[in-house]
Amino acid sequence: MKKIAFHIQKGGVGKTTLSGNIASYLSKTKKVILVDCDIQQASSSTWFLNHEILKLDIKDFLLKKMDVDQVVRQIQKNFYILPCVPSGTFRRDVQHELQDFPYLIDDFCLELEKLGFEFAIFDLSPSFELWERRIILAMCEVITPLTPEFLSLEGINIFKEEFESLLKSYRKKVKHEKIICNMLNKSFKRHNLHLRQFKTFGYDLYEVGQDAKIAESQLYKKSIFDYYPESRSVLELSRLGDALCL
């Protein structure tokens, strides 16, 4: 099972939108689960109706030791989600558990693999505490979304330093080869300037433009591939999804 996390310590860059759309794309040919690891439940809210009550979520598996198949919810064929319900004590409780059981996330991923999942896509919060660090250490690859803004230049450098330090400390290998320039508008001079800078970083770069259809698709609880397959964003998102299958 391939384990992919979308992460950077900055909000508003489109981690949730990108992770959900990539998970949806991969589910056309693979069995995929989207794991909502953000206590703001962004992914869970994106894929479920506002009035729908999610009684069980990721903490019921991690903390209450419920079977993972009782917690996952199916969105469509081959596409599942492990939701997260807001809780004021979730981060504290799960980080306490991780101190006692440092391989909790690794064991969790093994349980997902037993259910036949071929991809697990993790949507992380813009933090870098024990919760996020343990998830990253269990991944095959981390993908960093950026927006074409000045602060993104500093953000990717900070993340790279902390990411490399984390891997060195635990002697782990996790790929970090792909970045996404998200919400790009090439009619803006500053966006083109930052895009050129992103191209010098040495990563595989994916360019996803500003797209009102992506925002609209969330209103209908659909991916851009199902809501508006003619979208300008589909080609580059598909290219990223195909690269993850290699």
UniProtKB/Swiss-Prot annotation:
Positions of transmembrane segments: none
InterPro entries: AAA_dom, DNA_Partitioning_ATPase, P-loop_NTPase
Pfam families: AAA_31 (PF13614)
Keywords: Plasmid
Entry protein name: Uncharacterized protein BBD21
Organism: Borreliella burgdorferi (strain ATCC 35210 / DSM 4680 / CIP 102532 / B31) (Borrelia burgdorferi)
